[in-house]
A protein has these predicted regions:
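Long, charged, low-complexity intrinsically disordered regions
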Residues: 1-62, 69-132
């Protein structure tokens, strides 16, 4: 179990250090936000799954999930601990890091989602034009 002030850090193999650093520092524009305050664990899990599926469908890659620090929950940081665990189980989640203070600090996480096949192709084509 995490503590209210603990940071959440998770990065899949293959995620470039520069990409992870940029996420950790809050440098990517936040494209969507989910607030889990006042939700039960079951409601929160359902909301997280639904939210991330919607984001993936809409080609949204950078989101913030506000879970709260859980200072008054019993046990402390219960929601935070579960959110950290759930996100690692979702294969479309590339990396996760606790947010900067201006986005919620240790009561929120940045989530970077996998790029769609379409977006990967666009990036590849853009780099090909630049190189060739």
């Amino acid at each position: 179990m995490l503590k209210p002030d603990d940071f959440i850090e998770f990065k899949r193999d293959g995620v470039q250090d520069g990409v992870y650093r940029k996420l950790r520092l809050g440098k990517y524009p936040i494209q969507a936000r989910l607030d889990l305050h006042r939700k039960t664990l079951k409601e929160a899990r359902d909301e997280v799954v639904k939210f991330l599926k919607q984001c993936i469908k809409m080609d949204i890659r950078t989101v913030v999930i506000v879970h709260g620090r859980g200072e008054r929950s019993n046990p402390p940081a219960l929601m935070k601990s579960f959110v950290a665990s759930w996100l690692q189980q979702i294969r479309e989640v590339q990396c996760v890091h606790s947010a900067q203070r201006f986005h919620g600090g240790s009561g929120a996480v940045y989530v970077l989602l996998r790029k769609s096949a379409e977006k990967k192709m666009e990036t590849r084509e853009r780099h090909q034009k630049r190189l060739g």
